[in-house]
Amino acid sequence: MVEDSQETTHFGFQTVAKEQKADMVAHVFHSVASKYDVMNDLMSFGIHRLWKRFTIDCSGVRRGQTVLDLAGGTGDLTAKFSRMVGETGKVILADINDSMLKMGREKLRNIGVIGNVEYVQANAEALPFPDNTFDCITISFGLRNVTEKEKALRSMFRVLKPGGRLLVLEFSKPIIEPLSKAYDAYSFHILPRIGSMVANDADSYRYLAESIRMHPDQDTLKAMMQDAGFESVDYYNLTAGVVALHRGYKF
């Protein structure tokens, strides 16, 4: 039970004290880190690769630029950005969770992604970088786990260079009603079973489904980005809104 005097937030469908959420999310990702890539393929039927490819294509990243892959996990986007920025550029893979960061580092080194990638354990709400550092920031399937999303968006805005852009790839709200119902059935009944069988962790994947439902919808997130200072904010619905890619600029 959370005392009324405490500031609260949501952890899935639970109401928890704000200071508790980060530890609870950390526990989830410590638990799932070793099976993260396998579960991504199973949960999305491999479609997450297309969503990430679209994000890369919309990034405008060029040779010599500096990119922050925030909540970068096992490094899918970092691997692509590393090739795009080349030897004269740099990619920082940042994640608040050390288990996920370790998995990302091992995976990328095993496939030969070295030299222009750095690894930083960082909280999105208080990024440890100077103002105006990055040409591009991406956060892929990570924003919904952040306790204070508005604070994180302001932090991202601060470390972007003028002319830089933020891309937020995140689960969103399906725009077709029959799909929405089928998606709910899959998320709440099938997904935890897959998590139990493959990762021996139904609870973490039940949290995943709940956290998606609690995440702001497309237009709400667009407004939040605008409030944080981003301009020319737009979004693309992917797979009929199951996922949305938001993009905003710092001018």
From Swiss-Prot:
The keyword Mitochondrion does not apply. It catalyses: a 2-demethylmenaquinol + S-adenosyl-L-methionine = a menaquinol + S-adenosyl-L-homocysteine + H(+); a 2-methoxy-6-(all-trans-polyprenyl)benzene-1,4-diol + S-adenosyl-L-methionine = a 5-methoxy-2-methyl-3-(all-trans-polyprenyl)benzene-1,4-diol + S-adenosyl-L-homocysteine + H(+). One of its GO terms (molecular function) is 2-methoxy-6-polyprenyl-1,4-benzoquinol methyltransferase activity. Keywords: Menaquinone biosynthesis, Methyltransferase, S-adenosyl-L-methionine, Transferase, Ubiquinone biosynthesis. GO terms for biological process: aerobic respiration; menaquinone biosynthetic process; methylation; ubiquinone biosynthetic process. Its EC number is 2.1.1.163, 2.1.1.201. This is Ubiquinone/menaquinone biosynthesis C-methyltransferase UbiE. The gene is ubiE.
